[in-house]
Regions:
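Glycine-rich phosphate-binding loop signature in dinucleotide/nucleotide-binding domains
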Residues: 85-88, 154-158
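Conserved SAM-binding motif I beta-strand of class I
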Residues: 113-119
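Conserved class I S-adenosyl-L-methionine
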Residues: 88-99
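Glycine-rich helix-loop-beta junction characteristic of Rossmann-like nucleotide cofactor-binding loops
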Residues: 76-87
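S-adenosyl-L-methionine-dependent methyltransferase catalytic module, highlighting the catalytic core
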Residues: 33, 37, 41-77, 100, ...
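Conserved SAM-binding loop of SAM-dependent methyltransferases across substrates and taxa
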Residues: 100-111
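Short catalytic micro-motifs in class I SAM-dependent methyltransferases
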Residues: 166-171
Length: 290
């Protein structure tokens, strides 16, 4: 336990590995209700099972197996923030870049408002969000985040209590500070933004470079789904977030991508005994100041 600069007592949740939350968050009725509600997606195996009955392509099934642990990790962070808002439903969520996670969010928070923002082109769909996946167009706001460099093209949405931008920022060619400045306009004062993105300095990528292999994917020949343009380190993301007008509430590096291979098992073992800077994913919680 420690005390923040605001004088609140803070509890370091063991399951949150270093994220700081006011201890009152764990005692309010909203948190207890969320804990009772979200019992189905605590483990990655439950997420894989949830989608098993679907007639999904092998690409989509592989994507779910790879990202199920990340989805469970992200849902835990979302639940903690939702509990900390200490307000009755509906909470307004904005999922930037809809995916399978959007469905998990809707199932986990049935009383709340789930909005989405981003592309809705067939070309932009892929293993992460196939065309036959259900999508509520009534709560979807179409916007190309690369247009964040043009303030006259900004759109508005109902202000979000919690926005989620998971595995999105690395797909954009527009400067990330401009993107986050736009996203900031979609969040209410005191609201939160969760950013998830791959760690460009992970152990696997360092080893690839050491072996003379390029650690990053070639940009694809698909303007609507080009792959990764740029990945950002923890230090870069902190600086970008502050420049965009956010407060950094927490940051964690974690190994939440699952790959079934002997090489992956060896890398997992090495990462588990190395510094956190070698882990594969970065999750950052940002707050819009009041």
């Amino acid at each position: 336990m420690r005390r923040s600069s605001l004088g609140k007592r803070l509890f370091v949740s063991p399951s949150c590995n270093g994220f700081l939350f006011p201890i009152s968050w764990f005692c309010n009725e909203q948190f207890l209700n969320l804990e009772k509600l979200r019992t189905m997606f605590r483990m990655s195996v439950e997420i894989v099972k949830h989608f098993q009955a679907r007639n999904l392509s092998e690409e989509s099934q592989s994507y779910i197996r790879t990202h199920a642990k990340r989805y469970a990790f992200l849902l835990e962070k979302v639940s903690m923030l939702a509990a900390g808002l200490n307000q009755r439903p509906p909470i307004t969520f904005l999922d930037i870049g809809p995916s399978f996670f959007t469905e998990l969010l809707r199932v986990s928070f049935p009383q709340d408002k789930i909005m989405t923002l981003g592309y809705d082109f067939p070309e932009s769909r892929g293993g992460h969000f196939p065309m036959d996946t259900a999508h509520d167009n009534r709560q979807h706001f179409h916007f190309n985040l690369n247009d964040a460099q043009f303030p006259d093209r900004y759109i508005s949405t109902p202000p979000a209590d919690i926005a989620i931008m998971a595995e999105v920022i690395e797909h954009l060619y527009t400067a990330p500070t401009l993107v986050l400045r736009f996203v900031r306009t979609l969040i209410r004062s005191g609201g939160f933004l969760i950013v998830e993105t791959p760690n460009p300095a992970s152990l696997k990528k360092r080893l690839k470079l050491l072996w003379g292999k390029h650690p990053y994917e070639m940009i694809r020949e698909n303007v609507e789904n080009p792959g990764h343009f740029r990945e950002y380190t923890k230090g870069e993301l902190c600086a970008i977030a502050k420049s965009a007008g956010f407060e950094v509430s927490g940051c964690e590096l974690s190994n939440y991508f699952s790959h079934d291979s002997s090489k992956a098992s060896i890398l997992r073992l090495l990462r588990s005994h190395g510094p956190s800077s070698l882990r594969r994913g970065i999750t950052m919680i940002l707050r819009k100041p009041v």
